[in-house]
Amino acid sequence: TEKGVSYWAQYLEQQEIGKPQDVVEQENHLSYLLQYPEIGKERIDARISEIVTEIRNAFDAEFTPTEEEKKEKKQTDAILYLGYESYLAKENQLSLVFFETHETNGELSPHTQIQVFHFDLEKDAEVTAESLQSDSFAKNASAYTEKYFTTTEPYKNGIFGNYKTLLAPDAGRFDRFALTKDGVLFYFDRYDLFPGSYGVVRLTIPYAEMQKKIEEPKKETPVP
């Protein structure tokens, strides 16, 4: 349980809504240290429970020994860590962010899998990320992020790779976001744009920046 409490603690300050539910279980060589919120809305809570079950089932499938491995008595001791952040952007708009990390044979994976889900509290229903995006959403996010990461410490000295391609509007990195009181929060995976020492990188873009109209570059008239 100490491991679970330590893992969950890093997300506590970003839990704006929901009562944390802790699951600490062990089955044979697999352990589960899970935390998720109870919101108090029947259908949303049922969906959250379903998401946690899906994550758990995928973990089980990955680490359950095959028949061959069972014969050879090979198995991997594994722990599933699950933590969350929850953001209330407006009165009824909830963004729920799950963080999933695996530990195998005592080694903590350097990768954290991040999933974001959106809910309308008034309608007690899940909503799609697409329904929350304006036409210029990805373009504005791309322009702001590229400028921010290439001009701001400590990011400008760490960004690597072909970041213009990686941060292009259609590259998929702006499909995963949370809506907060301050703006749109994007998560960039460890090792994606920066060295591993940066960890998971978060960037909140103010709503005013996300709503700007982007002018198309003017075509220059060739000189005769």
Which stretches of residues belong to each language-model region?
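Compositionally biased intrinsically disordered regions enriched in Thr/Gly
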Residues: 1-224
